Each structure stands twice: as C-alpha cells, then as structure tokens.
Amino acid sequence: MAKEALPSIYDYTLDELKEILKPSFRAKQVYNWLYKKYASSYDEMKNLPKELVEDLKENYPIDIMQIVKKEQSRDGSIKYLFKLRDNHTVEAVLLLMKDKKIDEDGQIVRSEKYTVCISSQVGCKVGCSFCLTAKGGFVRNLTVGEYIAQIVNIKRDNDIAENKALNIVYMGMGEPLDNFDNFTKAVEIFSELDGLAISRRRQTVSTSGIATKIKKLGEKDLQIQLAISLHAVDDELRSELIPMNKAYNIASIIQAVKAFPVDTRKKVMFEYLVIKDKNDSIEAAKKLVSLLNGIQAKVNLIYFNPYPGTSYQRPQEKDMLKFKDFLNQKGVICTIRESKGLDISAACGQLKEKEANGNS
C-alpha cells in the first residue's frame, strides 16, 4: 500500500492502539508522545524499542500534514494553511482571547484563552454564496487523523502547554456533519484523558443545517455544543445564501434543534452572518425572535468579512447594534462576535485562495 494511503497514527483511539501494539502498554507510551509532547517523528520516542519504531514508521505515518503558510494578525490570531499527503490544502485558525478571572484572594487574574477553528473537508458541498471555500467545490472528506493533526500541529507550533485549556470549533472549511463518522470519532479522540484531554463541552460543531444529521448527532449524545449557521429568517433568502436550504428548510432545522439534547448550562448557538441590506433590518430581528421561541438559544451576530469578487457588503455598526439590542430586549441573548484576523486572510478559504494565486 502506498504511504499516502496508509492510515495515520492519529486515526486511532487509545483502545484501538492497544489492540494493535503489543504489549498493550506501548499504546499509552505512543499516546503520551503524540499528545503530551507533540512528537513530530517516531525517532523522538526514546522509550520505544527500535523494532517498534521501525514498524510504526512503515505502517502508521505521523507526518501527514505540513504547515505551508501562516499569517499572524495584530490581535494575535494565526491563520494556518496545511498541505496534506495528497497535496490538497486546508485551513485552520488559532484565535487568541483575553480571559479575566477572580482568584481565591479576590484578585483579577488575566490570562490568554485559545480557540482553534478547524476544517472538516477539502472544499465543501454546501456551496454557500458568501463563502470563498465554495468556489473550489468539494474534493474529499478529511480523515480522522487530519482532524487531530490540525490541533497537534497548532499546539506544537505555539508551544501550548498540554494542560492549557483549549476550545475546538468545527467551523473551518467544509461541513462537519457531512463527514459524520470521521468527525464524531475525532471528538472521541480529542477528549481522551490520556491524549489531548479536550473536554467535549469545549468542542462546538457548527453546521449549515443538515436536519437529519442534527437528529443523528443528538441520538449519539456526545455532549458537545451545537451551533447552527442560520444567517436568514426566511427560506427565500436562506436558499440564496445556503442552497442546501432547499433540501433542509428553516422549519426542519428548528424542529431538529428542539429535539437536540442540550447541557442545561449551555445554549444552542445560532450564528447569524449579517450582510448589509440583506438581513440586517429590525423586521428580520423580529422574525428571528419568533423562530427561536421555545429554544434555549443564544444568537451570535457576525460581521460579513468581505473578500475580492464578492458583491456582499459589511453591515454598518449602528445596524448591528440595533439588531443586537432588539433581540436582548426581547429576552434572546445576543452578542456581536469580536472580529478577529481582519488584517489577515481570516475568512474560510481566503488564505488557500491567496496561495493558489501566488500572492504573498
């Protein structure tokens, strides 16, 4: 079998590795090197016998993803372009947030909080009219290992301590629920205590609204957070923005969300990309309040981030504030997402497009 076709070491849960590697305690040693020390080669794994190292090199590739380009924003955000074994590329973004907590002495402690937005597919089938990723069409699903390697590469590149809290958002290139089996297995591997130990409650899946898959995800009860890319309050506009809405309309999505098991401490996030003169009116806000009636919801308003060639425009700040204030007055928790990476190619597909066009 060609090396590029072999499963990666990152494709396996700890229990699966215990079945493969003998004696089974070797699996935990390998996991420790992969996810606690972020080893980039088997030669670094000094407590493994030479025969095992050679077997791992031959049959379980570790170097499945390379950083080919990255851009750092003034706000600390970093956009990554990764090259895969078949030379396709995907993007991920490290978002750096400022966190403020009160310690046991009542003192304010300031720290940094990390969120990583990762991709699920090379390209995308959904074809959203506002998204640059759609321009390239769909190529393939990411493997389980390619999900995992995005986080490992970013933690290694930024020397993020193994015990540093980190949030994962499945909101990069592609539709995660269209890659259901690989996505859900990645959730499992990310959360393994002997591995990266990223709590499932720190993982959020963002979907364009495949109602049947939302139902299926709810039945698995993975205890992850759900975010819906809604972006419109009527089917006509949503079908323009997200053509898949013709198959899964707003009513079917809302029905699936109402059946989704939600942690009582959390809410279902509804992402609403605000586009000037498209969906930024108070009339739209009124319809949104009505749609979300009976749902434990939070609305996250997002400024449209323009890219070359799009006809859509960024909304005015005053209209965003009016929209937010109206929802809050009606009892719907609403925030405006802090824009990150405005001075870099932070929107999905932008860095990939720049690299393809040979731009620096």
Swiss-Prot record:
EC number: 2.1.1.192
Catalytic activity: adenosine(2503) in 23S rRNA + 2 reduced [2Fe-2S]-[ferredoxin] + 2 S-adenosyl-L-methionine = 2-methyladenosine(2503) in 23S rRNA + 5'-deoxyadenosine + L-methionine + 2 oxidized [2Fe-2S]-[ferredoxin] + S-adenosyl-L-homocysteine; adenosine(37) in tRNA + 2 reduced [2Fe-2S]-[ferredoxin] + 2 S-adenosyl-L-methionine = 2-methyladenosine(37) in tRNA + 5'-deoxyadenosine + L-methionine + 2 oxidized [2Fe-2S]-[ferredoxin] + S-adenosyl-L-homocysteine
InterPro entries in alphabetical order: Aldolase_TIM, Methyltransferase_A, RlmN_N, RNA_MTrfase_RlmN, rRNA_lsu_MTrfase_RlmN/Cfr, rSAM
Enzyme class: transferase
Disulphide-bonded residues: 117-348
Keyword Iron: yes
Residues forming the catalytic site: 91 (proton acceptor), 348 (s-methylcysteine intermediate)
Record's protein name: Dual-specificity RNA methyltransferase RlmN
